[in-house]
Amino acid sequence: MNRTVAAIDIGSNSTNLLVVDATGNELVREVNVTALGEGVARTGVLSQAAIERTLKVIEGYARVVASHAADLHITGTAACRMAGNTNEFFAKVKAATGSDPRLLSADDEARLAWHGAVASLPAVEGNTMVIDIGGASTELTVGTPQGEIVDSVSMPFGVVTLTEAELHSDPPRAEELSNAISMVGDAVDNAAIERPTLGGVSRVVGVAGSIVTIAAVELGLREFDSSRLHGMALTKDAAEDVFRTLATERLADRVHNPGLPVERAGVIVGGCCILVAIMRRLGLDNITVSTHNLLDGVVSAARLTGQGGKP
């Protein structure tokens, strides 16, 4: 494909934009927390407030896409899979952008996120696992150095849904944190038993907002710096340290941590619980952080095929 390509990822916690020119150079990358998945696990529908704030961001993105005359590809993930009114929401997205959103299956989401996360990292011998912590689901995906997906599991919790289900106090009580970590850990244990192909990897890569934020807090970044975060080794000890700090602070104090965007402060402890539980149960000493993600996978597939993520 020799045209500028744009992708909008309508996630359960954030709505994101990537625009890439005909030579593959990144022109625009934006992230906005819209919490589309807020309450969906309880109600089974996307709330009107969540729809309105997400559409407001998408309308702004549509203007950016139009200014670059880009081919636009829009995807929806876990919250949209869960909700009974997704068709109504997608109709509004199409009206705002002129493009039909595509509802990704869990397998497609995992595949595109894996390719997006790994493509810009140095090659390694052996398989790579990608941990993708979203707003309403978490994927563990293993692929080969040749880019073949070996196996993937999607677990039915993310930072929004885990926070809503388990972390009710400010700061969360020890019992709440323990329950959240146990729930995630049990799911990881079951996945490891049922999917032995998830083991024996050479590298583990962490992707999406929570993991990038945990890394940014560990570095104490006052401004987002992809050059310091992308490819960074985040150790288990560092992840545990960030978890202990953020989980014991009230929200009003937590927001002052360098590296933590205010809009993520309410759910970041849930993200810490998920990452720490995964690293504990899989015995991971460290992971490699990737600031590239599902968006990059969608754009790459679109540039290769012109079919919006269907290589």
Put a short name on every predicted segment:
Residues 29, 139:
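Short glycine-/small-residue motifs
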Residues 3-5, 19-22, 35, 39-68, ...:
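Helical "lid/coupling" subdomains associated with nucleotide-phosphate turnover
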Residues 2-16, 24-26:
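N-terminal amphipathic/basic leader segments beginning at the initiator methionine
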Residues 30-34:
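A structural signal for short, well-ordered beta-strand segments
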Residues 9-14, 131-137, 158, 207-211:
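A short acidic Gly-Thr/Ser loop motif
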